[in-house]
């Protein structure tokens, strides 16, 4: 089986802890659910891979659409991993700015998307059920009255199920290798706009107040040999 690896042109993570701060240039990207002063928080990963690079692989390397695709992330550190959990992936509905911020920047960096906003400089609130009279078909997000925002995503399109997940048990290797074949296929065909993918924990573990589940992965800005990749495979 042949494998071609693509690297993100932008990646970040959005987090409720500072819902208007960007982390688009951080060396780590994080998913999690954890408390801060008793208030549940969440973190989600966003990645984008260029249309032109996907098309080049499909058109010039494979020559057809008989391929699989997965997002590969290498774990840097994990805290309070539960006995079992899943990570979920969806194609993102809305355009977002990557930014050049880092977690912990003072003052907060606003050069890219955040938990609350899709655009730079805290512009363009994410389109979500709480601020939109009628959400587009097959588009959703999550609602938390304490933390408005968190991105939006496709659940399906053109008969394709666009939700995928990877499940883990205690003591498993929790590097991510999560299938996104249908999403990449619809990006390639233009059936949905390519705004990348969002990765998140199970709903039950986000906004956690009883444990601190935090999984940090190397980002495209890492100085290691473990940046994220989109692995496209074919026979």
Predicted regions and their residues:
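Secreted, disulfide-rich extracellular signaling modules
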Residues: 1-235
């Amino acid at each position: 089986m042949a494998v071609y690896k693509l690297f993100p042109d932008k990646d970040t993570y959005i987090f409720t802890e500072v819902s208007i701060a960007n982390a688009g240039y951080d060396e780590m990207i994080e998913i999690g659910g954890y408390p801060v002063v008793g208030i549940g928080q969440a973190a989600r990963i966003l990645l984008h891979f260029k249309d032109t690079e996907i098309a080049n692989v499909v058109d010039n390397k494979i020559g057809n659409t008989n391929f699989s695709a997965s997002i590969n992330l290498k774990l840097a550190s994990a805290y309070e991993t539960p006995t079992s959990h899943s990570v979920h992936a969806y194609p993102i509905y809305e355009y977002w700015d990557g930014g050049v911020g880092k977690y912990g920047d003072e003052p907060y960096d606003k050069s890219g998307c955040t938990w609350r906003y899709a655009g730079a400089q805290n512009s363009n609130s994410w389109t979500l059920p709480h601020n939109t009279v009628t959400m587009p078909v097959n588009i959703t997000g999550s609602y938390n009255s304490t933390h408005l925002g968190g991105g939006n995503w496709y659940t399906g399109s053109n008969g394709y199920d666009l939700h995928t997940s990877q499940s883990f048990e205690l003591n498993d290797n929790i590097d991510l290798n999560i299938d996104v074949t249908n999403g990449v296929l619809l990006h390639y065909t233009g059936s949905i706009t390519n705004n990348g993918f969002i990765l998140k924990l199970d709903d039950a573990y986000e906004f956690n107040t009883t444990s601190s589940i935090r999984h940090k992965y190397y980002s495209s800005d890492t100085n290691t040999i473990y940046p994220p990749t989109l692995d496209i495979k074919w026979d």
